[in-house]
Amino acid sequence: MIQITVIQIDNYGPWTVTPNPRRESDLQALQSRLYADLNLMFGAHKGLVFYTRFDNLIAITNGIDLITHKRIQESIRNRYPFTVSMVIASAETPYEAQKLATETLQEYGSAQDENRKEVLDVANELVVDGYVQIAHIDINNITGTLTDIVSAYDTYLNVNKVKLALMEELLKYNALLFFIGGDNFMAPSNGMSEEDFLDIFNRINKKYKIELKAGIGIGRTAEDASNLADIGLEKIRGKLVDKNVCTLKQDDFLESKMGMGKIYHPQF
């Protein structure tokens, strides 16, 4: 089971134009700061936040309880000129979890309802003994094939084409995908196999002539899974595996490191 928290700024659209439209540069900076602060706050508890549309964010929050969510919510109220609402849900797949959380939040009223403030609810249950699977996907040799050859905007356009293709393909497996900068994407993907990813990569390569690779991490929290995914991706880059996917599981990884005589102090 994966635990997802949907985060939404309360009544944000009307606030941006009241009493007059606010400077766009200020709004962009404010949204970026909120994303950064939320990642730091949830990250302190081994969670991970993705910005989606900036006024609506999705966080992977396995291991994070309701009290911690409440404290984060209060901290945002104290730091920002607006409030946020949060709903937590769990499911076998990321898409199912975020959908359930979203539907529960919508039951409290519109995102632009001035009377709906600081909703905090659990749609079904908090995850006690679940896991997180995250794939860190990137484009093979984007520097040599795009960055150093075509314009900055054309590279950006191609990256977004790949992003959309990945989002549509992964949705067939009830997985999610988020852009995380450069040519990198992260996909919460509980239940997917390496073969599923290879099939998707082959279809995208046939259509766009772009090769992809992915480290896949499976851990108890978003931080554990994403760290393992990063290590798996480095194994592919270092040609330590013979295919474009590499899966690392938390317990297996810790056992292999301990067996090499290294001392680890995992925080579970």
From Swiss-Prot:
Gene: gch3
GO biological process: biosynthetic process
Annotated EC: 3.5.4.29
Species whose genome carries this gene: Methanocaldococcus jannaschii (strain ATCC 43067 / DSM 2661 / JAL-1 / JCM 10045 / NBRC 100440) (Methanococcus jannaschii)
Family: Belongs to the archaeal-type GTP cyclohydrolase family.
Lineage per the UniProt record: Archaea, Methanobacteriati, Methanobacteriota, Methanomada group, Methanococci
Record-given protein name: GTP cyclohydrolase III
Oligomeric and partner information: Homotrimer.
Catalytic activity: GTP + 3 H2O = 2-amino-5-formylamino-6-(5-phospho-D-ribosylamino)pyrimidin-4(3H)-one + 2 phosphate + 2 H(+)
Additional observations: This enzyme couples pyrophosphate hydrolysis to the guanine ring-opening reaction. GTP cyclohydrolase and pyrophosphate phosphoydrolase activities probably occur at independent sites.
Documented effect of changing residue 136 to Q: Decrease in GTP cyclohydrolase and pyrophosphate phosphohydrolase activities
Its job: Catalyzes the formation of 2-amino-5-formylamino-6-ribofuranosylamino-4(3H)-pyrimidinone ribonucleotide monophosphate and inorganic phosphate from GTP. Also has an independent pyrophosphate phosphohydrolase activity.
